[in-house]
Structures are given as C-alpha cells and as structure tokens.
UniProtKB/Swiss-Prot annotation:
Residues 1-27, 89-99, 168-181 are extracellular. Disulfide bonds join C99-C176. This alpha-adrenergic receptor mediates its action by association with G proteins that activate a phosphatidylinositol-calcium second messenger system. Its effect is mediated by G(q) and G(11) proteins. Nuclear ADRA1A-ADRA1B heterooligomers regulate phenylephrine (PE)-stimulated ERK signaling in cardiac myocytes. Residues 52-64, 123-143, 206-273 are cytoplasmic. This is Alpha-1A adrenergic receptor. The keyword Glycoprotein applies. InterPro entries: ADR_fam (IPR002233), ADRA1A_rcpt (IPR001004), GPCR_Rhodpsn (IPR000276), GPCR_Rhodpsn_7TM (IPR017452).
Amino acid sequence: MVFLSGNASDSSNCTHPPAPVNISKAILLGVILGGLIIFGVLGNILVILSVACHRHLHSVTHYYIVNLAVADLLLTSTVLPFSAIFEILGYWAFGRVFCNIWAAVDVLCCTASIMGLCIISIDRYIGVSYPLRYPTIVTQKRGLMALLCVWALSLVISIGPLFGWRQPAPEDETICQITEEPGYVLFSALGSFYVPLTIILVMYCRVYVVAKRESRGLKSGLKTDKSDSEQVTLRIHRKNAPVGGTGVSSAKNKTHFSVRLLKFSREKKAAKTLGIVVGCFVLCWLPFFLVMPIG
C-alpha cells in the first residue's frame, strides 16, 4: 500500500505552495522508480502470457498464480506511477477525489494479492495432503469461486473510505495521506493482512507436518516394495509355487505407489518454492502492518 503524505505533515486547512522540485533528485528518482515499475509490469505480463500460451499450465493452481500476477499488474500499472510522481514532486498534484480513488485501488490490489497468497497456501495444503484426490477436490468451478471471493472481500475492505469511513480530509489538496480513522485502520489491517497471514502460517505448518509424515511413509513403502520384489524373484528362481497372481498384484501396487510418489514429490516441490515466495512477501509487508495500527 503506497500511502504518502506531501511536504505538509499536518492536516492544515490552508493550502501551501508546493516547494520547488530538485531536478537532479527528480531525475534519479524517476529513473529508479520508473525502472522498477517497468520491471513489475513486464514481469507480471510474462507470467500471465506463459500460462495463457501453454495448455499444460491451464490448471487451477496456475489460475491462482495468474490471479496473483493480475493483482500485482494492476498495482504496478495503475497505482505505482502516481506514487512515483508523488514521490518525485513531493506533493499530490491530482486533486482530492482522485486521491481517494487512488488510495482505494491501492488497498484493493494489495489486499487481493495477499489473499491470493492465502488461497495458494490452502491449495498447496490440499495438494500435499491429498495428492491423488486433489483433482476432484480442487475443481475449476471451486477455484473460480475462490478467486471471486478474494476480489469481493478485497473490494469490501478497500471501499470504506470512499463511503465516509475516514477522518475529515485536509483542505490542502496537495496532501494525500492514509486515513487514520481507528476503526477502519484496525478493520483493514486485520482483513488485508493479519487474518490471511494467520491462515497462511497455519496452512504451511500443516504442509510441513504432512510432508514430513508422508515422506517417512513413502520411504517405508519403498523399502517394503523392494523387499517384496526380491522375495518374488527368489521364489521364481527356486521354482516354487506359481506366483502369477502375486506378481500381477505386486505390479499394480508398485504402479499405484509410483504414481503416488511422483504426485507427492511434485506437490512437495511446488509447496516448498511457494513457501519461500510467501515468506519473503510476508517479511516485506510485516513492518508496514506492524506500524500501521500504531501510527
């Protein structure tokens, strides 16, 4: 969330003339911030195109990733350019009405992004816990409903200030700052970060526990499977009783075990990668949401 205040740090009722812009500082900031914005826009577009252009990526999990990219793309293309201009000029140059809309879109995109990570963590928990039943549990219809809920909840959290849930705005229109109304600050902090964060942490703790248990079970199953195969081979070599039925059964069990092992390995790897991404994301957001309710 990019809420900045202008040169005037108070909520004075008089309009202050904007301070002169330092050209060298403005150029440096423009290059750095512009580069970051372009990098963010292109990166998220590439994610969306890679999923759209490869049919084998048309799965619910990848739809969640596209949703995350869409939220970040909206943020980088509609919010950050005005934030960059705000930072370069040192004051808000777009008027009070647009300030309120800009702030609401900022909250909408950031909340949708964080809730998108929450949905991904739930998806990874189901994938690791139920790798064989995953396609029947996480259907396309349920996935789309989850994404619809993400954006609906994000919209509810973001539009409060537009309907008056904020402190009186300063008359100086060069000031655009975060609403400090205590009720909304607490509501948005809980809904946008702390509740999703709690769900994410619980889900990844469960993923860790299940992955550890499944890894132990699969290793044990692998040893048993090898032992059974050796026994069958030994019986055939010694020309004991016919073992055709046992061989077929053993082959079926081995195939089922191999499929389960492959699916679990994929889900575990995906969960580990996304866990690192989510962890970095949470660490980046945590300072802001720790200071926000206090400030």
